[in-house]
From Swiss-Prot:
This is Phospholipase A1-II 2. The keyword Hydrolase applies. Residues 392-403 have a biased composition (Acidic residues). One of its GO terms (biological process) is lipid catabolic process. GO terms for molecular function: phospholipase A1 activity. One of its GO terms (cellular component) is cytoplasm. It comes from Oryza sativa subsp. indica. The active site is at 218 (acyl-ester intermediate), 218 (charge relay system), 286 (charge relay system), 323 (charge relay system). It holds the Pfam family Lipase_3.
Length: 403
């Protein structure tokens, strides 16, 4: 993949790579999909925990503790925390039952990572990744967010000042741009946390060939769409130390199961950004990508798959099955089009589709929702009492300037 990275990241708008689906592109998409899955695996979703809404692991240990194929290829450099206005907060953010929790008004929403030396050698460049956490829930969350559109001019730079006033979903924009000066984790908006870190990494690696890849699933896909447009529109893909911003890193968004983010004006502004590409993976039976149904437009190049053709999955799967990220990755591994059958070109373990759901056909001896932390992170102490230990403190919680 190292010699083809520009092609795989959309330099030619993926012409000739989608039907049939290129095997290197399959592997590339699965790698990024696993990096999104890391946000689900590491998120503390237990309401009773005082750490609910936080990340379970330290940045230094993240890729070693989650299920990714290449844990040595990237290092997490910053965690992202997001809050939102009252109309959105209770619908998509988790609040711990314990009011002493640190994430009572915000949630961990992902991370920024950069390719290590090992990863840069394998990938052909120094790749900077922004991974946004989404939701594995099906239709109810996106249907709940029936909010009016809001102007996207603030994130589109000059492209947003052309008189067309492009608009995006107010709820997604709120998650991306809201801050809380009373929060130790969200004094900066998620937007500024990411842009500040991107700028730092672009300066740090100004003498190397770099790329910026923004990834997400479901709700995270909408945030990735906003973030990728923001980076390209406001020239965060250049180093402030390079004369005249002469070196511009390509920005690519890779999203799975994405709802629509903005209107036609936003779509047109997105497509005019010369350094920006987007590949949107859609599973045909998934209804989430059709929301909101009116007034919004699809963005980027679509890769359509249909996991109903897989012989490994339940024939009449649930709505959550069609939206499940692991099922999307299963589809990427084996999809050959409507009339070519289904065969796993990439040897991806079918047991993974039952990690957080009940998707695998009954003849396979794999328990449903088998990804459970040992004893749900309850640890027996020397005094014989059990206590919850589900969070490793991270320097990023307190120090915004850590390298």
């Amino acid at each position: 993949m190292a010699s083809r990275w520009r092609e795989l990241h959309g330099s030619g708008h993926w012409d000739g790579l989608l039907d049939p689906l290129d095997v290197d592109l399959r592997r590339c998409l699965i790698t990024y999909g696993e990096m999104i899955m890391a946000t689900y695996e590491a998120f503390i979703g237990e309401h009773r925990s005082p750490n609910a809404g936080m990340c379970r692991y330290r940045r230094a240990d993240l890729f070693r503790r989650v299920d990714v194929s290449h844990p040595g290829w990237y290092a997490a450099t910053r965690y992202i925390y997001a809050t939102a206005n009252a109309d959105v907060h209770g619908k998509v953010l988790l609040r711990p039952l314990c009011r002493e929790g640190r994430a009572t008004e915000c949630n961990w929403m992902g991370y920024v990572a950069v390719a290590t030396d090992e990863g840069a050698a394998a990938l052909g460049r120094r790749d900077i990744v922004v991974a946004w956490r989404g939701t594995q829930r099906a239709l109810e969350w996106v249907a709940d967010l029936k909010l009016a559109p809001a102007s996207a001019a603030g994130i589109l730079g000059p492209e947003g000042a052309d008189g067309t006033d492009p608009s995006v979903h107010r709820g997604y924009l709120s998650l991306y741009t809201s801050e809380d000066q009373c929060s130790e984790l969200n004094k900066q908006s998620a937007r500024m946390q990411v842009l500040t870190e991107i700028a730092r990494l672009m300066d740090k690696y100004k003498d190397e060939e770099t790329s910026i890849t923004v990834i997400g699933h479901s709700l995270g896909a909408t945030l990735a769409t906003l973030n990728a447009a923001d980076i390209a529109a406001n020239s965060y893909n250049t180093s402030s130390l390079s004369p005249s911003g002469e070196t511009r890193a390509p920005v690519t968004a890779v999203v799975f199961g994405s709802p629509r983010t903005g209107d036609r004006g936003f779509r047109d502004a997105f497509h005019r950004l010369r350094d920006l590409r987007m590949l949107r993976v859609r599973n045909r039976p998934d209804r989430i990508p059709h929301y909101p149904p009116v007034g919004y437009a699809d963005v980027g190049v679509e890769l359509l798959i249909d996991t109903r053709l897989s012989p490994f999955l339940r024939r009449h799967g649930s709505e959550s099955q069609s939206h499940d990220l692991e099922c999307h990755l299963h589809g990427v591994a084996g999809w050959h089009g409507d009339h070519r059958g289904f065969e796993l070109v990439v040897d991806r373990d079918v047991a993974l589709v039952n990690k957080f759901d009940d998707c695998l056909a009954d003849e396979y001896p794999v328990p449903v929702r088998w990804k459970v932390h040992h004893n749900k992170s309850m640890v027996k102490g020397p005094d014989g009492r059990w206590v919850l230990q589900d969070h490793e403190p991270d320097d990023d919680d307190d120090d915004d300037d850590d390298d």
